[in-house]
UniProtKB/Swiss-Prot annotation:
Gene field: Rsu1
Physiological role: Potentially plays a role in the Ras signal transduction pathway. Capable of suppressing v-Ras transformation in vitro.
Pfam families found in the cross-reference section: LRR_14, LRR_8
Membrane-spanning parts: none
GO BP annotations listed: neural precursor cell proliferation; positive regulation of neural precursor cell proliferation; Ras protein signal transduction
Keywords: Acetylation, Leucine-rich repeat, Repeat
Organism per entry: Mus musculus
InterPro entries associated with the record: Leu-rich_rpt, Leu-rich_rpt_typical-subtyp, LRR_dom_sf, LRR_domain-containing, LRR_R13L4/SHOC2-like
LRR repeats: 41-63, 64-85, 87-108, 110-133, 135-156, 158-179, 181-202
Ranges where the record places region Disordered: 1-23, 250-277
Bias kind Basic and acidic residues: ranges: 7-23, 256-265
Protein name per UniProt: Ras suppressor protein 1
PTM annotation (N-acetylserine): residues: 2
Amino acid sequence: MSKSLKKLVEESREKNQPEVDMSDRGISSMLDVNGLFSLAHITQLVLSHNKLTTVPPNVAELKNLEVLNFFNNQIEELPTQISSLQKLKHLNLGMNRLNTLPRGFGSSRLLEVLELTYNNLNEHSLPGNFFYLTTLRALYLSDNDFEILPPDIGKLTKLQILSLRDNDLISLPKEIGELTQLKELHIQGNRLTVLPPELGNLDLTGQKQVFKAENNPWVTPIADQFQLGVSHVFEYIRSETYKYLYGRHMQANPEPPKKNNDKSKKISRKPLAAKNK
């Protein structure tokens, strides 16, 4: 362990410092950082831009953590013990290699921000209790492999930001209309052709709201409304005409558009040896 890392641990312990930043230190294992798991007092741990491939179960010993940042590592799996961090409010796992989330992951009672952008996750990756995370205010799932967004998304009623950009989504569930506190919705770069009329329940057209939906193969009537502006889209999907057309469209069960995103070249898919060169 480098002297600087050792010094960080010692200073945090001696001065009772609540925040520890170990970003960009070439760390390949948390177990190599002697004394790290004895810092039970810390509330923030930043390990972004390292070379971690796993998170050891010992992470549960950092029981006062409120912010945990693993952005831009090579993490392929998480221990079930991560859900025992009951004070956690902000968890950043963006830009890793996760294919699945551990069972019990949804039992974090205070989690407000969950960053999972740029992994290898899909609708089958989520544990059964994932949508018990009812305290979530921001959920980032962009740059993953979701084709379907589970209907249970409607349980996350405190969501203000939902980012689903650059997945393989072929539809959105009607339950998305239950997210009445939503201020930002990012669905650009998917395979969406229609929007559920229930989306019209949401107010996403104001100056402080964000609705991004470009680069989708919309059916012509929706594409025409996008030419006029977002407010026209929402006005249209609230109309009886659209509700009728949407019903007909869903009954016909059309073939979904082909995938247009080649994700085989994603960094998160490359063998680790190739990535480290």
